[in-house]
């Protein structure tokens, strides 16, 4: 007799597709950036400001959505903001000026704010404690594959049509998330009289329901030193990652002189090399611990930036450098999400992730504009990447001070 598929896997599939589309759009901008710089006649700093407009709105809305995720129906939130993301992506095919482009990408950022914290929180609700690393590792492949495919698919579309058509196509994928999530997502296992997949028999649905009613106050969370240590680490690691991610294709095209389609493969190398890291490192962390694995990830971010600088215009070495970066880039975000569930009260996961996203967003806002400005002033991205290496080191320092619950974190 065939065993029915646990609905947790349906949730994970829909979440996977949602993350895939979201990151195809979000990171697709960095791939399209060289063409948009030429077409819109903007500087690297202005191109960075467009990315920063996305991250500004993303940062403003993410804490609100984290708060609402713990209190409202997460399915309805994801459906609504999928539509907003689709609308903003459609408008990205229409801008005629820098202010318009910033506004339209900011709308995309509003929608995208619900495509990570609520989705990750939902996925964790459907899986047991010892299966979260696995589930989040699988989920994170969505953004690596999305980013990787964009590096291969967008350049031919730009050549045949233009960058505006690429945004139009991406908007269709975003709009498709509305019916997909509306039909498949469920807010919690108890809605279907299920317990999380992989949960031990001693954990009954009623226990989770009682836990959900025991709301933890935001003021109590803010007193926890661990909250601030991880948040600060998150800021620096986000800055480090997105200086590289935002500008690596532009660096290859406009500074090193590689053909556009070839430079776009640097993005694909980051993404596809990340599949192994996204699968192996989160699962490994279920046994070795999140802290050890995240210290390793932060350290390797710093080393990756230095490796990219060292590679120069040697294509094979550069490809190897960005691939090394990709392994740890893909694993970082689900690992931080799992840390929220492990080091803080379970019923506050959405609020914790939402709070951290403020700091994450600050790093993301600063990275494109500051990285682009330094490249304009110095005439090279080398100093921008060196700054990313320093940020990776600072991320390691702050995360290394994290204490396990009950070991004096207050």
Give the predicted meaning of each segment.
Residues 27, 55-63, 148, 271-279, ...:
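Residue-level signature of mid-helix packing/kink "hotspots" within the transmembrane helices
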Residues 29-33, 224-276, 281, 367:
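Extracytoplasmic gate region of multi-pass secondary transporters
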Residues 41, 73, 94-99, 128, ...:
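Helix-breaking motifs and short loop linkers at transmembrane-helix boundaries and internal kinks
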Residues 60-99, 285-291:
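Conserved MFS/SLC helix-loop-helix module at the cytosolic interface between two early adjacent transmembrane helices
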Residues 88, 99-107, 316-324:
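Paired small-residue
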Residues 104-142:
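Cytoplasmic helix-loop-helix junction between adjacent transmembrane helices
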Residues 139-192:
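Helix-loop-helix hairpin linking two adjacent transmembrane segments in secondary transporters
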Residues 268-280, 285-339:
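C-terminal transmembrane helical hairpin of 12-TM major facilitator-type secondary transporters
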């Amino acid at each position: 007799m065939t065993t029915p598929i646990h609905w947790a896997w349906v949730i994970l599939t829909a979440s996977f597709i949602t993350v895939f589309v979201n990151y195809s759009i979000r990171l697709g901008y960095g791939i399209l950036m060289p063409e948009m710089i030429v077409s819109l006649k903007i500087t690297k700093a202005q191109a960075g400001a467009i990315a920063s407009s996305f991250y500004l709105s993303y940062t403003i809305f993410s804490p609100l959505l984290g708060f609402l995720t713990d209190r409202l129906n997460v399915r309805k939130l994801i459906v609504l903001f999928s539509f907003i993301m689709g609308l903003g992506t459609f408008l990205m095919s229409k801008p005629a000026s820098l202010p318009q482009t910033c506004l339209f990408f900011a709308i995309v950022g509003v929608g995208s704010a619900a495509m990570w914290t609520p989705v990750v929180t939902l996925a964790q609700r459907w899986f047991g404690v010892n299966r979260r690393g696995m589930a989040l590792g699988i989920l994170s492949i969505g953004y690596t594959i999305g980013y990787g495919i964009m590096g291969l698919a967008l350049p031919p579309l730009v050549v045949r049509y233009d960058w505006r058509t690429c945004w139009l196509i991406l908007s269709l994928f975003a709009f498709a998330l509305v019916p997909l999530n509306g039909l498949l997502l469920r807010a919690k296992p108890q809605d279907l009289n299920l317990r999380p997949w992989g949960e031990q028999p001693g954990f009954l649905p009623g226990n989770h329901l009682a836990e959900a009613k025991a709301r933890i106050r935001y003021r109590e969370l803010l007193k926890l030193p661990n909250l601030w240590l991880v948040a600060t680490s998150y800021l620096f690691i986000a800055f480090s990652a997105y200086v590289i991610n935002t500008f690596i294709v532009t660096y290859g095209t406009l500074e090193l002189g590689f053909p556009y389609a070839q430079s776009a493969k640097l993005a694909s190398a980051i993404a596809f090399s990340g599949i192994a890291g996204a699968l192996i490192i989160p699962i490994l962390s279920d046994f070795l611990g999140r802290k050890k694995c995240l210290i390793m990830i932060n350290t390797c971010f710093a080393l990756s930036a230095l490796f990219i600088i060292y590679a120069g215009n040697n294509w094979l070495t550069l490809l190897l450098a960005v691939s090394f970066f990709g392994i740890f880039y893909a694993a970082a975000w689900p690992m931080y999400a799992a840390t929220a569930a492990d080091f803080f009260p379970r019923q506050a996961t959405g609020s914790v992730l939402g709070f951290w996203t403020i700091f994450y967003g600050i790093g993301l806002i600063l990275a494109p504009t500051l990285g682009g400005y330094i490249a304009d002033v110095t005439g090279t991205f080398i100093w921008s990447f060196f700054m990313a290496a320093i940020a990776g080191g600072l991320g390691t320092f702050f995360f290394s001070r994290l204490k396990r619950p009950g070991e004096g974190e207050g």
